[in-house]
């Protein structure tokens, strides 16, 4: 299975193309914490565009803030003040026409450790 993993941080957005647990391609874009929601979303799309292929099946996103994974909403990111109640799952899913899953980055780390070990 091929999927895209994304880490939205306060200083960088990182994306990787992962196949069978191996990172085949990765890309990173610096984030200006003072940028608008729209600018950061555009940077996010640019980053994903560098790693996505027509074989990609899903996109997973880790966010360092308050997230409702079931609703797909990012309520707050401390290091990106412009992000308040962003319906991130819907935005990314509509842009790429793929299923998208988001969660707090610490939860993503814990799930990865449980599934794959350190």
Over which residues does each language-model region extend?
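Generic secretory/membrane-interface signal
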Residues: 1, 6, 26, 58-62, ...
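Short glycine-rich, Thr/Ser-proximal phosphate-binding strand/loop in the N-terminal lobe
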Residues: 2-39, 74
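Residue-identity detector for threonine
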Residues: 11, 53, 89-92
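Short glycine/proline-enriched coil/turn segments at helix->beta-strand junctions
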Residues: 18-23, 51-57, 96-98
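Glycine-rich phosphate-binding loop and adjoining helix at the ATP-binding site
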Residues: 37-45, 58-59, 68-118
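Conserved active-site "lid/cap" helical segment
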Residues: 43-53
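Short glycine-rich anion-binding loops that position phosphate/pyrophosphate groups of nucleotides
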Residues: 64-66
């Amino acid at each position: 299975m091929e999927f895209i993993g994304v880490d939205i941080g306060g200083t960088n957005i990182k994306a990787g193309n992962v196949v069978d647990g191996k990172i085949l391609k990765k890309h990173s874009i610096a984030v200006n914490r003072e940028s608008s929601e729209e600018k950061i979303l555009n940077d996010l799309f640019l980053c994903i565009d560098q790693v996505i292929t027509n074989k990609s099946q899903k996109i997973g996103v880790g966010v360092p803030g308050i997230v409702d994974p079931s609703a797909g909403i990012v309520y707050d990111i401390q290091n990106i003040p412009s992000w308040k109640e962003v319906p991130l799952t819907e935005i990314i899913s509509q842009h790429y026409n793929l299923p998208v899953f988001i969660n707090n980055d610490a939860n993503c780390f814990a799930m990865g450790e449980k599934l794959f070990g350190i």
